[in-house]
């Protein structure tokens, strides 16, 4: 009986396989028909667009609107072709059968990376971003529900959730279950190289990731995610989800992505078009502040890295106390500059003290200059009203007398001079403070002992500013000063902002961003265990939560309440690499978050001790050749800093090409992310890349070789524990460590190759 039951089950599976293969064939036929029609449409639209453009350029300006409509149609057709071509490679990845309990109707939906329609109206494959598709990611068989973009909950009974393994026109298999099938497919994908994994992420989005992706669009969030937990993946898919479901509320140009370096930003941007996301804005953090300050910056200036500053200076100007002190100084200066006494002349009272105070309180968020100008305007209006019956010349003289009443004490200063004046004031205040430690009376414990700076450090800081050399924190401070002194209002250009590797910046920058963009919804992602800027970055999230997330206790603010999420599952590394990384964190004293690696085994971590630099170079070359033979497409050589990366590149000779890729056998085949622009090479995944550790943030590689982490390079400290944790968690499949001398203590006890 058991044998017969097994036979019947096998027959059922085989029949289902045939039926699903037939459905796949039908989908492919629809897609090919779509492509045929779209390519014909493209010829027509391209020709029309060319004719309109030529006529417009010849002077027919009335055709401008028609040209814009035609260009929009051209973009739409091109995007549709791209989506259908992508669907040819993998039409769909999931299927759900469910009963809508409100309508009493049964549905069977196939879900893919791109929505595919037949005859332009009939949906044959549902886009993964559609509301009902969330059932696939979160629903379990039986009674459940899904939320529409408008917030309505739809009760359903889920009868089947099926996951497909498809390769072009071939259905290789399918799995029916709740989460096991999704996990099984995920593990299978993770075993592939990096390029393959990136192309198949939508098929393996996990429940906790899906919850974040489909959060309300106006909700701000902080995401603490361990290395490899998919923080960046969640962000780009959330952008795609929002633009798909709320296209009437959000334009791509209103979405801004912030990253710590151009390599990371290019890596993120490269994945957006495949998710139907175009024309978003991307900035490094310092470039964002440069953009916000705009014309208030001097004609000649240079943005410098924070690494050139003293640690005491960095600790001060990256702190919350520092930017809050800027605001207090601005208010104190405003009180000194703007007269608040009643404006009275002879028998006329133009403005009472109460009305002036009331105005300043009501428009507290306006800049000093804006308040002065508006008060002068109000005073002029009051004079005209009160002296309406007076002789015109008398009234004119009175207006002239009080024309600059509220700005008479104001000395016009450049933004740089305002910043210098503040720094002089702060230095004097700290020098006169008994403990010479706190920038403010209510400075918290974390800022204690961070503000003690020598006179030399103060002098060097002010000299740099005066010469026009600004780091990210100088720019943040000046952005806050511009907002408090010069700007006309808040910045409302960006409705959504996504900040990756957030822990690398101090809370000061977030305080300024929030002040300048109070209406923006933020998604802030990071891992405090990966803070590579120990003196200035964040080692916990508490201050940031207070700044960026609205009060969660206010029930009337449900739609805007901020959320803090933790992602503990690591999908990037093998068990062996994850355990190795966890041992590094175990030796540290800072707060860490638990890592839950997906069960995927690989090779043990390789530890290679060599006698000298020449032997290390030979070992690196041998490892590169070995890794290429294993068909790894992305291999990173990670060094402590840029100098070591440049030196390693000069020493490393190209190994012979053993794959199908055409690589010139010169040292140029080993690229240098510190000196040359190699972001395209990294994204394409066809080269061995030499990188300083700081530039690896947010990236991942099939294999990593960590170069010379000996006791001379890395101390047994929390600072270096975070650096090494970042380095080793870049590897998807293999990690090798090559060194001379004594291996640093942070790595010496980690589980390695026997």
Language model features with spans:
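Extended, charged low-complexity regulatory segments
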Residues: 1-202, 206, 210-214, 439, ...
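P-loop NTPase Walker
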Residues: 2-34, 38, 188-303, 696-697, ...
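Acidic, Ala/Val/Gly-enriched low-complexity intrinsically disordered segments
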Residues: 5, 437-443, 662-663, 670, ...
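Short, hydrophobic/proline-enriched secondary-structure or compact coil segments at domain edges
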Residues: 92-98, 473-482, 638
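A structural signal for short, well-ordered beta-strand segments and their strand-loop junctions
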Residues: 95-97, 163, 222, 234, ...
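Short glycine/proline-rich turn/loop motifs
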Residues: 183-190, 460-461, 561-563
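Alpha-helical nucleic-acid-binding subdomain
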Residues: 243-498, 503-512, 520-521, 539, ...
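Conserved helicase motor core of SF1/SF2 NTP-dependent helicases
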Residues: 253, 262, 266-278, 283-290, ...
């Amino acid at each position: 009986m058991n044998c017969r039951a097994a036979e019947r089950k096998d027959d059922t599976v085989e029949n289902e396989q045939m039926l699903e293969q037939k459905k796949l064939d039908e989908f492919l036929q629809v897609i090919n028909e779509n492509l045929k029609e779209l390519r014909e449409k493209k010829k027509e639209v391209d020709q029309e667009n060319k004719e309109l453009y030529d006529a417009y350029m010849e002077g027919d300006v009335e055709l401008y609107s028609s040209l814009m409509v035609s260009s929009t149609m051209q973009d739409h057709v091109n995007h549709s072709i791209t989506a259908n071509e992508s669907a040819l490679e993998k039409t769909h990845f999931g299927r759900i059968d469910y009963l809508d309990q409100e309508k009493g109707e049964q549905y069977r939906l196939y879900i893919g990376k791109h929505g595919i329609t037949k005859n332009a109206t009939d949906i044959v494959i549902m886009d993964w971003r559609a509301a009902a598709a969330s059932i696939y990611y979160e629903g379990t068989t039986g009674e459940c529900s899904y939320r529409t973009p408008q917030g309505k909950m739809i009760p359903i009974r889920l009868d089947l959730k099926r996951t497909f393994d498809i390769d072009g026109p071939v259905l290789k298999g399918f799995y029916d279950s709740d989460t096991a099938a999704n996990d099984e497919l995920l593990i299978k994908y993770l075993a592939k190289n990096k390029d393959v994994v990136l192309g198949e992420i939508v098929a393996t989005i996990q429940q906790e990731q899906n919850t974040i992706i489909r959060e309300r669009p106006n909700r701000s969030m902080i995401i603490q995610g361990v290395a490899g937990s998919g923080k960046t993946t969640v962000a780009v898919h959330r952008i795609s989800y929002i633009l798909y479901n709320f296209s009437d509320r959000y334009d791509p140009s209103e979405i801004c992505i912030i990253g710590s370096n151009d390599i990371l930003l290019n890596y993120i941007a490269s994945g957006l078009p495949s998710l139907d996301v175009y024309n978003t804005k991307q900035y490094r953090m310092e470039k964002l502040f440069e953009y916000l300050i705009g014309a208030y910056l001097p004609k000649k200036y240079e943005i410098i890295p924070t690494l050139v500053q003293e640690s005491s200076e960095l600790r001060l100007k990256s702190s919350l106390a520092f930017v809050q002190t800027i605001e207090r100084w601005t208010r104190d200066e405003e009180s000194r500059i703007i007269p608040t006494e009643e404006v009275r002349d002879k028998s006329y009272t133009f403005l009472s003290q109460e009305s002036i105070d009331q105005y300043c309180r009501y428009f507290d968020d306006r800049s000093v200059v804006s308040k002065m100008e508006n008060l002068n305007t109000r005073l002029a209006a009051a004079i005209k009203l009160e002296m309406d019956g007076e002789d015109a010349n008398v009234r004119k003289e009175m207006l002239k007398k009080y024309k600059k009443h509220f700005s008479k004490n104001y000395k016009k200063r450049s933004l740089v001079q305002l910043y210098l004046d503040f720094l002089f004031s702060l230095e004097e205040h700290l020098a006169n403070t008994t403990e010479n430690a706190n920038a403010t009376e209510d400075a918290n414990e974390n800022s204690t002992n961070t503000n003690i700076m020598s006179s030399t450090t103060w002098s060097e800081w002010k000299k740099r500013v005066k010469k026009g050399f600004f780091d990210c924190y100088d720019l943040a401070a000046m952005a806050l000063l511009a907002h408090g002194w010069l700007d006309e209002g808040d910045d409302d250009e960006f409705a959504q902002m996504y900040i990756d590797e957030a822990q690398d910046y101090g809370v000061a920058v977030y305080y300024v961003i929030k002040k300048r963009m109070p209406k923006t919804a933020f998604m802030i992602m990071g891992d405090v265990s990966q803070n590579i800027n120990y003196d200035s970055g964040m080692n916990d999230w508490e201050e940031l939560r207070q700044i960026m997330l609205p009060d969660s206790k206010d029930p009337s603010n449900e739609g805007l309440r901020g959320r803090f999420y933790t992602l503990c599952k690591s999908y990037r590394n093998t068990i062996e690499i994850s355990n190795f990384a966890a041992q590094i964190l175990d030796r540290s004293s800072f707060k860490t978050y638990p890592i839950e690696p997906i069960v995927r085994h690989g090779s043990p971590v390789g530890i290679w001790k060599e006698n000298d630099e020449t032997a290390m170079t030979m070992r690196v070359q041998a490892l590169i050749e070995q890794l290429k033979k294993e068909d790894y497409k992305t291999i990173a050589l990670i060094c402590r800093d840029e100098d070591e990366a440049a030196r390693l590149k000069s020493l490393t000779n190209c190994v012979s090409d053993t794959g199908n890729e055409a690589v010139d056998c010169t040292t140029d085949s080993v690229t240098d992310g510190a000196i040359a622009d190699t972001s395209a090479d990294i994204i394409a995944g066809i080269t061995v890349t030499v990188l300083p550790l700081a530039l690896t943030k947010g990236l991942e590689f099939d294999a990593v070789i960590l170069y010379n982490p000996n006791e001379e390079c890395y101390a047994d400290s929390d600072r270096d524990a975070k650096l090494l944790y970042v380095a080793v968690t870049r590897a998807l499949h293999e990690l090798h460590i090559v060194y001379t001398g004594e291996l640093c203590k942070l790595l010496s006890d980690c589980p390695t190759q026997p």
